[in-house]
């Protein structure tokens, strides 16, 4: 128990001789260092706030302006046009013996220079914002850049400093524009034309016209008004109504998973892998806090919004009866760990020092070696986060609002993130196709009680050292967690490394206090609620069919030879595969980002178009020449690319209609058109997984350093969820989900149709493939 006593700064006991105080120098040292570290963080935040506030200016540029003003004065040149003299006359008289005419003159010049500097910053920032409103570059053909775009790019570079911080561009990003109602309705009708017969389409046209003429103008005015004062007219409502107000389980329905590197393995030692990975994660968090991470830039010059990254760590979704809330802390010095039905609190720091990988390995090994059994009700406690939100909110209020249960729950909810240590082993074996699907299922839902689905993300560790993530969706979208994951995996492989036996480098400090077991007092009534939530979650998990596979014949290398966008190629293949699978077309959702705007998140690309359906029907007929099919395919691909660009530049369909619908609800206005649009099911929900956001290594030199992406559950009960990652020149990973309870869907069958569709389209271009 010596380590436990070190954690107490002082103790006192009352004896017949008086009060006996005992101080722990080591504990006091840690308290002191922790305080110093906290003040350092505050000072860094203040410094970054100042630097961010004056961007694209800098303290250096301020000094340059002052020196220019002072220098011109010494040369008897008044560049202020008399303003310095005016400021000098306005300064109060007799403010001390040191206020000589020279100091008054210098102070006046400093005030003038500061005013010029601030005015220049405002001008440059507004100019940069205007330049970032230009999106013509997105619609130009690859390799054919116009002179206007060249001039625009040169101006962007001139106004951007060479070393921007993570949030430097936030105030320069333009706001998401509100599209014209007529344009949105026109694009909507165009998107549903291939899905409706003539009679249904005519009825929808009438509904749309009635809405546009009678209801929409009033709703649009309120929406435009909101866009003037809000940072983003969509994002706050999207977070609240799509995510936080959802009452169904987060598991499968909302949370998504991310896979590890699957073609290489750095170590088989579970604790060692965790030591490196968690050390890398906290290094990333430190860079995030200090804003040292470079903002993601399109073309290397167009900044993407970094707002979502703020809540990556120290964030938990707190359940409520009507709506959940996101609780975000400025800092957290520990992680919560689950192993064999027990919860632990593991400190990440010793005083002000971040634990080294070998120390973290030792701490996790202590947890793995701990033989203590779970407390009553503890083993399946996390099932509360996997079940219904109302039941969890009621249980939280009834059983976790006081005493040791409150303290233990706070240790989890206030952790930097959650770590799950599994006893099973999962990995990808190319010789065993089912292995990737089993791995994905374990990440998506586990056994329904070994993940804390409310945390911003859960780091999942399998017995063989393989890892993965399960991420909550409300706080951010997949590219944000992907940015972290790329950094962590790259740091693990190329910077930290392992010994020959697979352990972390260096010797650990055995004097570290071991992780702390969280203590619970869970009554029988609460245990019954836990079991009920577990049964709900288990039924949901058992109904999910997940089929993951690596497509080996080709990747983006061959697709580029077909002179088309890789994303458009895959999306059209999905349309062909779906028609072969179901014999009909369906409303298709593809997620696109709107992060070129301030606080932008996503927009929907409706991938099922008249052009893509024409190509699919021609393929099914089998009577067209390859030249005709290629022409139809190129038209479909061009249409898809244009729709994707429109979505990225704020001219999408669904977010605008979603916000108009919410305004109608606030105003108590009934709209049959909006009600029907918002109730249409997405039977094919798709998403491309981003990669190479951080260039930590050359993929050509390390072709096996590939992650397999990740996936999510089906959006509709009778539909498919498809995510895909075009992982390299010669491979694509697919993750397909559906429900066993639907007689119309089968994930593996759909996967086979996708394979065949990709090969059939590639054959149209007669480009040799890696494998047949």
Curated annotation (Swiss-Prot):
Pathway: Lipid metabolism; fatty acid beta-oxidation. It comes from the Eukaryota. Strong expression in heart and skeletal muscle. No expression in liver and kidney. It is an enzyme of class 2 (transferase). The active site is at residue 473. GO terms for molecular function: carnitine O-palmitoyltransferase activity. Belongs to the carnitine/choline acetyltransferase family. Residues 74-102 are mitochondrial intermembrane. It is found in: Mitochondrion outer membrane. The chain crosses the membrane at residues 48-73, 103-122. One of its GO terms (biological process) is carnitine shuttle. The keyword Transmembrane applies. GO terms for cellular component: mitochondrial intermembrane space; mitochondrial outer membrane; mitochondrion. Catalyzes the transfer of the acyl group of long-chain fatty acid-CoA conjugates onto carnitine, an essential step for the mitochondrial uptake of long-chain fatty acids and their subsequent beta-oxidation in the mitochondrion. CoA binds at residues 555-567. (R)-carnitine binds at residues 589, 602. Keywords: Acyltransferase, Fatty acid metabolism, Lipid metabolism, Membrane, Mitochondrion, Mitochondrion outer membrane, Transferase, Transmembrane, Transmembrane helix, Transport. This is Carnitine O-palmitoyltransferase 1, muscle isoform. It is a multi-pass membrane protein. Residues 1-47, 123-772 are cytoplasmic. Its EC number is 2.3.1.21. It catalyses: (R)-carnitine + hexadecanoyl-CoA = O-hexadecanoyl-(R)-carnitine + CoA.
């Amino acid at each position: 128990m010596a380590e436990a006593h070190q954690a107490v700064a002082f103790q006192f006991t009352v004896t017949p001789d008086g009060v006996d105080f005992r101080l722990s120098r080591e504990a006091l040292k840690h308290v002191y260092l922790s305080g110093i570290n906290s003040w350092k963080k505050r000072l860094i935040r203040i410094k970054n706030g100042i630097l961010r506030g004056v961007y694209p200016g800098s303290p250096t540029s301020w000094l340059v302006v002052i020196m220019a003003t002072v220098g011109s004065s010494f040369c008897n040149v008044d560049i202020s046009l008399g303003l310095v003299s005016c400021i000098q006359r306005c300064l109060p008289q007799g403010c001390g013996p040191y206020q000589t005419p020279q100091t008054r003159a210098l102070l006046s010049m400093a005030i003038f220079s500061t005013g010029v500097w601030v005015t220049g910053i405002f001008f440059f920032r507004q100019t940069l914002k205007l330049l970032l409103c230009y999106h013509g570059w997105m619609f130009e053909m690859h390799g054919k850049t116009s002179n206007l775009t060249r001039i625009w790019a040169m101006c962007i570079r001139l106004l951007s400093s060479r070393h921007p911080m993570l949030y430097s561009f936030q105030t320069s990003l333009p706001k998401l524009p509100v599209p014209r109602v007529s344009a949105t309705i026109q694009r909507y009708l165009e998107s549903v034309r291939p899905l409706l017969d003539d009679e249904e389409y005519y009825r929808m046209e009438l509904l749309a016209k009635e809405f546009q003429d009678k209801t929409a103008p009033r709703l649009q005015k309120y929406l435009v008004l909101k866009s003037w004062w809000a940072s983003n007219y969509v994002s706050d409502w999207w977070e609240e109504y799509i995510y936080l107000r959802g009452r169904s389980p987060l598991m499968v329905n909302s949370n998504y998973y991310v896979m590890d590197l699957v073609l290489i393995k750095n170590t088989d030692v579970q604790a060692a892998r965790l030591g490196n990975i968690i050390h890398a994660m906290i290094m990333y968090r430190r860079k995030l806090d200090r804003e040292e991470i470079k903002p993601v830039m399109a073309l290397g010059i167009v900044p993407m919004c970094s707002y979502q990254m703020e809540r990556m760590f120290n964030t938990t979704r707190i359940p409520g009866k009507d709506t959940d809330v996101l609780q975000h802390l400025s800092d957290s010095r520990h992680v919560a760990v689950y192993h064999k039905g027990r919860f632990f609190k593991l400190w990440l720091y010793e005083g002000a020092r971040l634990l080294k990988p070998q120390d973290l390995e030792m701490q996790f090994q202590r947890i793995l070696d701990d033989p203590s059994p779970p407390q009553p009700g503890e083993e399946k406690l996390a099932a509360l986060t996997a079940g219904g939100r109302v039941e969890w909110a009621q249980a939280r209020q009834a059983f976790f609002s006081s005493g040791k249960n409150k303290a233990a729950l706070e240790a989890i909810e206030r952790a930097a993130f959650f770590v799950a240590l599994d006893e099973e082993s999962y990995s990808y074996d190319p010789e065993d196709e089912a292995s990737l699907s089993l791995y994905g299922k374990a990440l998506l839902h586990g056994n329904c009680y070994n993940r804390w689905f409310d945390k911003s993300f859960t780091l999942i560790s399998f017995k063989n050292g393989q890892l993965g993530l399960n991420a909550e969706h409300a706080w951010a979208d997949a590219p944000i967690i992907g940015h972290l994951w790329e950094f962590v995996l790259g740091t693990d492989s190329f910077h930290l490394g392992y010994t020959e036996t697979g352990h972390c480098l260096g010797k650990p400090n055995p004097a570290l206090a071991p992780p702390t077991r969280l203590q619970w007092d869970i009554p029988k009534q609460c245990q019954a609620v836990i079991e009920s939530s577990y049964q709900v979650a288990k039924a949901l998990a058992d109904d999910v069919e997940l089929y993951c596979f690596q497509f080996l014949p080709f990747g983006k290398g061959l697709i580029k030879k077909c002179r088309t966008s890789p994303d458009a190629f895959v999306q059209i293949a999905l349309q062909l595969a779906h028609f072969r699978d179901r014999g009909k077309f369906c409303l298709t959702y593809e997620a696109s980002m709107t992060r070129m705007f301030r606080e932008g998140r996503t927009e929907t690309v409706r991938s099922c178009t008249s052009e893509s359906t024409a190509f699919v029907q021609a393929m099914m007929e089998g009577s067209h020449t390859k030249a005709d099919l290629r022409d139809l395919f190129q038209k479909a691909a061009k249409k898809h690319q244009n729709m994707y660009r429109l979505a990225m530049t704020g001219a999408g369909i669904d977010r605008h209609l979603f916000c108009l619908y919410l305004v109608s609800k606030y105003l108590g206005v009934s709209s049959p058109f909006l009600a029907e649009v918002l109730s249409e099911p997405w039977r094919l929900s798709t998403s491309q997984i981003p990669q190479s956001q951080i260039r930590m290594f050359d993929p050509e030199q390390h072709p096996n350093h590939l992650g397999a992406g990740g996936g999510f559950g089906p959006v509709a009960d009778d539909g498919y969820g498809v995510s895909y990652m075009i992982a390299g020149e010669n491979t694509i990973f697919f993750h397909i989900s559906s429900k066993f309870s639907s007689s119309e869907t089968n994930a593996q069958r759909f996967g086979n149709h996708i394979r065949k569709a990709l090969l059939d389209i590639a054959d149209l271009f007669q480009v040799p493939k890696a494998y047949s």
